[in-house]
């Protein structure tokens, strides 16, 4: 306390209040057993992990067609598109099936469904709706 008074030139009463205040903040951080028992366990609130905010489908405009590579044991070229959704988000959507006709500014319908071996792809484009045609059947 004398150190505070000498170095900062404050009164004895202010120095004792400063020490008491710092002590209270250090002790006040922990809850007592009775307080923890009363309030129950502390549960963290995590942000929701829903890519389309709980909606099953969303319409979007294609910004760019992409080819993504899967994670380690698999090897392929997964056809994807970068889509600006009607919710305002920009996300990557996978195009299922063989071949597609998508270009920039086309409109697609996206559903929730992640691609397990490609990180960051949480949507799939729906074939046969808007500008994304059905899979063309091969002639034998």
UniProtKB/Swiss-Prot annotation:
This is Small ribosomal subunit protein uS12m. Keywords: Mitochondrion, Ribonucleoprotein, Ribosomal protein, Transit peptide. GO terms for biological process: courtship behavior; male courtship behavior; mechanosensory behavior; mitochondrial translation; response to hypoxia; response to mechanical stimulus; sensory perception of sound; translation. One of its GO terms (molecular function) is structural constituent of ribosome. CDD domains: Ribosomal_S12. Mutation of tko causes a behavioral mutation ('bang sensitivity' = temporarily paralysis in response to a physical jolt). Its main location: mitochondrion. Residues 1-30 form a transit peptide. InterPro entries: NA-bd_OB-fold (IPR012340), Ribosomal_uS12 (IPR006032), Ribosomal_uS12_bac (IPR005679). One of its GO terms (cellular component) is ribosome. PROSITE patterns: RIBOSOMAL_S12. Belongs to the universal ribosomal protein uS12 family. It comes from Drosophila melanogaster (Fruit fly). The keyword Transit peptide applies. It is found in: Mitochondrion.
């Amino acid at each position: 306390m004398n150190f505070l008074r000498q170095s900062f030139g404050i009164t004895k009463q202010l120095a004792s209040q400063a020490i008491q205040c710092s002590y209270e903040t250090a002790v006040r951080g922990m809850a007592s057993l009775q307080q923890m028992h009363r309030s129950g366990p502390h549960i963290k609130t995590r942000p929701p992990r829903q890519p389309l905010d709980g909606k099953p489908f969303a319409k979007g405009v294609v910004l760019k067609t992409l080819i993504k590579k899967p994670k380690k044991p698999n090897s392929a070229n997964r056809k994807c598109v970068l889509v600006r959704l009607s919710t305002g988000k920009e996300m990557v959507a996978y195009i299922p099936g063989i071949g597609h006709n998508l270009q920039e500014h086309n409109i697609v319908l996206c559903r929730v469904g992640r691609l397990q071996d490609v990180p960051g792809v949480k949507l799939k484009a729906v074939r046969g709706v808007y500008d994304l045609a059905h899979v063309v059947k091969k002639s034998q």
